[in-house]
Regions:
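Double-stranded DNA-binding cores of transcription factors and transposases
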Residues: 1-34
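Accessory alpha-helical DNA-binding modules that contact the DNA backbone or grooves
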Residues: 21-126
């Protein structure tokens, strides 16, 4: 979901932990909510657990335009391959940050190459 990716990117860039938690929690709650957002009256967005006042305008933007400008800002700050690494099972934003920032690896292909060379063993977050 848009909000899950936004939370992951915020964590990757070490954004405020409370903001990160807000986005990831909202993503989880929205995914578990029985009604699709598109079918809900906008007045009820706040009734979804975990969706606070600050996220409601973003939900409205997303439904009106199909875009989430706040997410797009985070995407612009992040190499495409790093975003792709967030989709690898078992590797969360914290490990991806170490792989990217400390090791200079910016794609799944580079990560595979580093694994084959056993370069990840030396890093606490990866070993």
């Amino acid at each position: 979901s848009f909000f899950k990716l936004c939370g992951q990117l915020m964590e990757l860039h070490e954004e405020n932990k409370f903001k990160v938690r807000s986005y990831t929690n909202a993503a989880f709650q929205i995914s578990k909510f029985p009604d699709p957002l598109e079918e809900m009256d906008p007045d009820y967005y706040g009734s979804i657990p975990g969706v606070g006042k600050s996220l409601i305008p973003q939900i409205e933007d997303l439904l009106d335009t199909g875009r989430l400008p706040y997410l797009e800002e985070w995407i612009e700050k992040t190499p495409k391959g790093v975003i792709e690494m967030l989709g690898i099972k078992g590797i969360g934003p914290s490990k991806v940050r170490v792989i990217w920032k400390d090791m200079g690896i910016e794609s799944p292909g580079e990560l595979l190459y580093a694994c084959n060379e056993s370069r990840l063993i030396d890093y606490k977050a990866c070993g």
